[in-house]
Amino acid sequence: NFVVIFTDDQGYGDMSCNGHPTIHTPNLDRMAHQGQKWTQFYSSAPVCTPSRAALMTGRLPVRSGMASSKRVVLFPDSAGGLPQSEITVAEVLKDAGYKTAMVGKWHMGHLPRHLPITQGFDSYYGIPYSNDMDRDPSVKGNWVTTGKTSPWSVYRVPLLRNAEEIERPVNQSTITRRYTQEAVKFIKDNKENPFFLYLAHSMPHIPLYRSKKFEGKSLNGIYGDVISEIDWSVGQVLNTLRKQKLDKKTIVLFTSDNGPWEVFKTHG
């Protein structure tokens, strides 16, 4: 089995196993201690859409048309997406008999013909693009100018199940927890089958949100809280694999998509 856990804009030093003094990540530390820790690694692009296209296809994003000198990432008004002609890792594994699921941020085309279920995934649960998109223009001030987070309802980001919109705007303060629940359910439901799970968290891309359970969890403000919740999520996945006796036959990879963005006060 294969589990790929992908975070959005997380920095190399945002984990205690990489030396952060105030953000504690015991589950990621366990992965680093018990597994392999890769410290030299290239991302194919510094932004979301092309780096994800490269992950899914193993090809430079310019070869799949998922890179541009003008609009480097896809937006809610974009008509394009990852071409059907591209072969994804999900398609390869599905053809080999694997059950496949994508949970989280896709950002390779939000129209039905470009969603994960057309690219080799049996199921999809998540948001189709970045969590800061489709912002209500009537609301003034945001994390860039104030360092504070606007209510999640300001960002009219949809939550999809397969190709159906089930919530809009999605409650982003619960999204990490719900992604985790969906991932755990998929593992349990497919414990008798070989599977590929792609869990792509929306966080810690700004704006930042975390559940009430993790408010004040870190000494490093809301950014630290968000990383703490992601670490909890990793622990839930690892513990589920162990309880289902799948840990010895599952490869788990954790990585950020392309590293951190700019400096936004308490937002990373």
List where the protein language model places each region.
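Formylglycine-dependent sulfatase
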Residues: 1-268
